[in-house]
């Protein structure tokens, strides 16, 4: 298939006066260009992922470059076979990333040392270095750097407390951190410095940049990179593909993400099509029998069919 579309991932920490008004105008500009995607605007900057044709994405990058505030913005570009989003959203938020800090960190004033892909790879090989994944748990489970630490957190804002609880393990080490495109690490690495960590580095441009580096070629990355659009997973390691994801239900190698059928749960989990059907698209018995189970509704299963599947599942689990 032809790769007629592109996906742009970018961010820029820069003061934006009257961010709410800017967000409204920026949405109109994006719609006029025919783009689809999701952009967050705050007084501290902008963070976005947009998709469109080559012409549309070129026009958008030109639009951004012509604004002095965004003239230095670095775009990570992926080719795609179709639009990665269905709609275009530009939303104003109090901050671009939420660390739930009483005293927020300004990355323009305080952040960890930037490491390019080659420097980051070399630093990972040093035995006195610890690598901390700054993403959510479900992102880590799909793919991560070899030997990286998986914080026991469900969301980014829980990370500072986890670090405080485990601080003694890392204080005397060189600490490296990474995330998808780099924006979360800008703030998180600055917070680590403020907390007293002596040697803090961050992967400049994130995993997305690391995977495209012609020299490093994604080396030491296992699995795939989770992305917040319809693609879900993007390959990073150009040298070898090691599957690290495990099926939620049986632990077998898996890189296929679904959301739990219970809309009140909505847990993201890895599952094969076979297991999704077997477990009615839900992570637990409580979610399987939830009256609003989306899997049951989407497949128009009758109550009798549901009860038959539940009985078979119960029998299988008991054996």
UniProtKB/Swiss-Prot annotation:
SUPFAM superfamilies: Rhodanese/Cell cycle control phosphatase. Keywords: Oxidoreductase, tRNA processing. It catalyses: uridine(34) in tRNA + AH2 + O2 = 5-hydroxyuridine(34) in tRNA + A + H2O. Residues 125-219 form the Rhodanese domain. Signal peptide: none annotated. It comes from the Bacteria. Belongs to the TrhO family. This is tRNA uridine(34) hydroxylase.
